[in-house]
Amino acid sequence: MDFYTTDINKNVVPLFSKGTVARTASKAQYPSWCNNALKLTNILLKSLRCKFQTNRCEDDRGFEVYCVILKSIALLMAAKESLILLQIPPSLPSGFPFRSPQLSFTYLSTRLSGSQHKSTHSHHINHQTHPIHSSSSNSNSNNRIPTKTDSSKQHTQHFSFANAGASNRDELLSIVRKIDKSNLKCCDCGSTATVEWVSINLLCILCIKCSGVHRSLGSHISKIRSLTLDNFTSLELMHLLQNNVSNSNVNAIYESNLRNFPVKKITANSDDSERSKFIIDKYQFKKFVIDSNQGREASLKSLIKAIHLDSVFMMQRAIAQSKYSLRELTASEKEQNDLNHSSIFQYSLKHYEIVDGTPIFFITEFLLCNGIHIDNLPKITTNWSPKVLEYWETKLEMYGTFQAVNTSRPRSGPHLNMHSNVDSASSYNKKHDLRVNIPERSASASKRWSLSSIPKSSQNLMSPTNLLTMHKSLKLAKKDKK
């Protein structure tokens, strides 16, 4: 088995000539040694995170302590990445695309200046771990620090709202607001009134006015749900809502280049036209995103790296910076790779978190919310656990059947880009005898309305005068009979 490490340039390189390290990794006690090192790193990170959150930068001395803690966290994260890289072979199959020294890791920026004092103090760094794959969300995006919740809170805040009542939905709203202080205000206009709407694919919370504009964009751009009215039955979606909704993270991506435009951010008092134009430029055209024109290869590399590190923030950034939609990326990736290579969808299924003995496929769920293609169930299932296959089958039944039905519907909108997975859905339906009754459509059925039902002759048209005359004639006829 090959092992991997990082070189001086922080790139992934094979660990075949590292002497003592390679021999240690090949010994039987390697798993216990690695797990103990990870546990120690997690303990140190947890302690530093507590110090980081409680420390206040009210004076120069406090800011110096703040910088020391931040640098220590960065060093520990770098050490933890080295430990994670030793576990790449179990999670990254042989022949997976882009497994090369170009798959480099970005590190948390420790270059803080006085001008960044206020902006960074409002963020907090938390780290998420699980037994299968350790995660690290250390990304250097315009000197903004992504926000994640504490791993200890993730296990205590994971609820099932299958039969959610009003009190439970209010509790969910309270949890989402406590994740990040930025969630107390609307992500787009900063309003504090009725901030109860969430975009489940963008992972931001909105006011009722901005949520209406998001709905008009289409579900392929923003999927809007109500935190107080809708029921969330998916464990994976609940995990994302309870741990990854952050307005500051979304604005760090979609407003990263806003200062270079003469456009001002909208406020709660902005009119409807200003609000609509700003939100369309922000999310549909990605006008304020830095480097939002990445090609397929660069986008796929960023996406694979984000999945490997279990970083939702990095996946958000990879999707935002690509000039292609996630559906287009995965479709092209599926065409380029042969059947012996794992797809991005299959690779994401190997990254999950165990909560109370149940695997939570939150990485795959986030990708599904953003339109990733779903593969057919494999013919050989020996390499997949029953829980993975169960989740896979459920999502294929949900999204695959839905796409098969939607293939008969006309596309609307000049910017709508929906490529349906017809072959995968139809083959899956035949295998599992999922019968979907789709009415046959005529040649003119693609039109919303037709002129065929309107009579060509004007004589057949009834005017109000003709109706009145007919009404009188009927009365006269009745009198004649009497």
From Swiss-Prot:
- BP GO annotations: endoplasmic reticulum to Golgi vesicle-mediated transport; intra-Golgi vesicle-mediated transport; protein transport
Q: Name one GO molecular function term.
A: phospholipid binding
Recorded hits in Gene3D superfamilies, A to Z, give: Arf GTPase activating protein (1.10.220.150)
What Pfam families does the record point to?
ArfGap
- Keyword Secreted listed? The answer is no
Give start and end of each Arf-GAP domain: 170-297
Q: Where in the cell is it found?
A: Cytoplasm
Where composition is biased (Low complexity), the residues are 134-143
InterPro entries according to UniProt = ACAP1/2/3-like (IPR045258), ARFGAP/RecO (IPR037278), ArfGAP_dom (IPR001164), ArfGAP_dom_sf (IPR038508)
Instruction: Mark out the compositionally biased spans (Basic residues).
Output: 118-127
Q: Which UniProt keywords apply?
A: Cytoplasm, GTPase activation, Metal-binding, Protein transport, Transport, Zinc, Zinc-finger
Start and end residues of each C4-type zinc finger?
Answer: 186-210
* Stretch list, region Disordered: 116-156
Query: What's in the GO CC field?
Result: cytoplasm; endosome; trans-Golgi network
Role description? GTPase-activating protein (GAP) for the ADP ribosylation factors ARF1 and ARF2. May be involved in the endocytic pathway.
Per its UniProt record, what PANTHER family does this chain match? ADP-RIBOSYLATION FACTOR GTPASE-ACTIVATING PROTEIN EFFECTOR PROTEIN 1, CENTAURIN/ARF
Q: What else is known?
A: Present with 396 molecules/cell in log phase SD medium.
Question: Can you name this protein?
Answer: ADP-ribosylation factor GTPase-activating protein effector protein 1
Annotated organism of origin: Saccharomyces cerevisiae (strain ATCC 204508 / S288c) (Baker's yeast)
